[in-house]
Amino acid sequence: MTDSEPQTLNNNSEITASHNDDILEYLSVDDYDYELPDQLIARYPLAQRSASKLLYLRANNANSQVEVEDKLFSELPELLNAGDLIVFNDTKVMKARLFGQKDTGGKIEVLIERLVALSDLNSADLDTITSNSDIIDMTVIAEKHIALCHVKASKALKLGQGLVLADGHMTGVMIGRQENLFILAFDTPILPDLELYGELPIPPYFERHADATDNTRYQTVFHDPAKLASVAAPTASLHFDDIVLEKLAAKGIQTAFVTLHVGAGTFAPVKTENLLNHTMHSEYAHLPQATADLINQTHANGKQVIAIGTTVTRVLETAYQQTAVDRQPLSGWAGDTEIFIYPGFEFGVVDKLLTNFHLPKSTLLMLVSAFATKKSIEEAYQHAIESEYRFFSYGDAMLLDKKVD
């Protein structure tokens, strides 16, 4: 199989087989809540990417205990071994936030979630569009540029309602809904316009608009310009600069890439009391065959695979479930993933996880709890708060060993 011919995932596939759900009936979302002093939310980046602190949650195989160690991020190469493999997410963040007015005059804010073609829409969405031909001119829509979007407005958009965004530089019309997203059709190509007129969609807890610094620092240093499709950064990767990358290479630590285009759902809290009832958001992911081969070889050599962030973890563990059946080697894969990783999940690929500190009640906090145990994460977060670590996207990092069974 080649990189251009990855295995694909049916969007309706279930990706829950690695949970021991036979013994899980109820997991309270309130068990993943915690209090965080406001001053520990990092709303701006440090002057140097690798100047962040690093909390190492080291698994002690001798006594099955976990040890917390305070480090600097620049010390990361010292915590890994020659022959280990680091896997990055090479996506790039779009300037996906737009401001403007509805054609009736009301203010509106639009966040582009995903660019699509009409052929990408499901049959129900297409039926809605075509059945409203008195409102929507399909001959015109076929020539437009389509996106799935989050919309904030005082009153909900109506079918066929026009939009004027970015001081008139972008215009479009609402042609349908897909669950909580609006289907908008724009008059001009979307990506070039976003680069010119859009605003980088920094997280809502920054409580500010993006500035020139964010245009650089809310992107990774190794992003692929051709993979401009995320609405949030793979934040664990924001700590890496050329200095750290050079140290890793000098020690003989390998690097490889996957792609996951991060959606706005990454910031969404779990709203169901029983987290087992939570519906996970969908994101496009790709594991190249070359990266799969490196992972297989790394494990064959007795070395470790280090996922840089929860996005990489979700790609690797989804691909493992889809391709590495019956103890077969991991293979290249591409498709949409809705994988929800919570305690009880059995990891098949990732040996260490580098990640930031996550929001209360978030699916990402549940993921790291599954990886290093809930008790260890609770203790580590308490230590981080007492030690005044910086939290969330521009905050400090954690390096987690996989839990000791």
UniProtKB/Swiss-Prot annotation:
Belongs to the QueA family. GO terms for cellular component: cytoplasm. InterPro entries: QueA (IPR003699), QueA_dom1 (IPR042118), QueA_dom2 (IPR042119), QueA_sf (IPR036100). This is S-adenosylmethionine:tRNA ribosyltransferase-isomerase. The keyword Cytoplasm applies. Pathway: tRNA modification; tRNA-queuosine biosynthesis. The gene is queA. HAMAP family: QueA. Transfers and isomerizes the ribose moiety from AdoMet to the 7-aminomethyl group of 7-deazaguanine (preQ1-tRNA) to give epoxyqueuosine (oQ-tRNA). It holds the Pfam family Queuosine_synth. GO terms for biological process: queuosine biosynthetic process; tRNA wobble guanine modification. The keyword S-adenosyl-L-methionine applies. Monomer. It is found in: Cytoplasm. GO terms for molecular function: S-adenosylmethionine:tRNA ribosyltransferase-isomerase activity. Gene3D superfamilies: QueA-like (3.40.1780.10).
